[in-house]
Amino acid sequence: MNILVIKSSVNEKKGSYSSHLSDLFIKFYLEIHPEDQIEVYDLNQFGLANTNLTIKNFEDKTFYQKAESDFWINKLRKADKIVFSTSMTNFNYSATTKNFFDAITVPNKTFLLDKNTGKYTGLLKNIQNVQILTAQGAPLGWYPFGNHSALIKQIFEFLGAKVRSDFFVLDGTKVAPNNQKPIADFVAQRQNQIKILAENF
């Protein structure tokens, strides 16, 4: 089984809650499936982190080259399962995540459009499951318009991936007393939930 782990928080260097979630999830998963192949990618280390879609690079097609679109699409095509983590940034997922989805949402590569019927068909049907792990500073419900986790789920489903696992949101990271705790300690408080997700993945 090939597991593709994608990290997309802008706080990776300072310490990312969502990245800690991902690391803990993979730790538990490997305890159950030590034979599986794990590939981990921090999107911040690649060109797409600083390559956003604009009118110019869309028209001249250079966006897809600079964002290494084919590289990421090929990684997705070879994966059996995905672990995707990011944090909420200004009520949405990170700009790096947006760049990633722009790079992989490509007609005739990851989805088909029937112009006669308007029907879309996702092509990433090889992906058997996606575990979405996110973090946000506010408690759940503070920003009902900012459901970044559900949006990520819907995009993967649009592209043909199965998302059988419930997404997990580590919320309230910026409010007391949570913001007084080391990241690892706060994440560890939810480790039983993460372990169950890993067991069912």
UniProtKB/Swiss-Prot annotation:
Binds 1 FMN per subunit. Its EC number is 1.6.5.-, 1.7.1.17. FMN binds at S9, S16, Y17, S18. The keyword Signal does not apply. Its cofactor is FMN. InterPro entries: Flavodoxin_fold (IPR003680), Flavoprotein-like_sf (IPR029039), FMN-dep_NADH:Q_OxRdtase_AzoR1 (IPR050104), NADH:quinone_OxRdtase_FMN_depd (IPR023048). SUPFAM superfamilies: Flavoproteins. Keywords: Flavoprotein, FMN, NAD, Oxidoreductase. Pfam families: Flavodoxin_2. The keyword Transmembrane helix does not apply. It comes from the Bacteria. Belongs to the azoreductase type 1 family. PANTHER family: FMN-DEPENDENT NADH-AZOREDUCTASE 1 (PTHR43741), FMN-DEPENDENT NADH:QUINONE OXIDOREDUCTASE (PTHR43741:SF4). Quinone reductase that provides resistance to thiol-specific stress caused by electrophilic quinones. This is FMN-dependent NADH:quinone oxidoreductase.
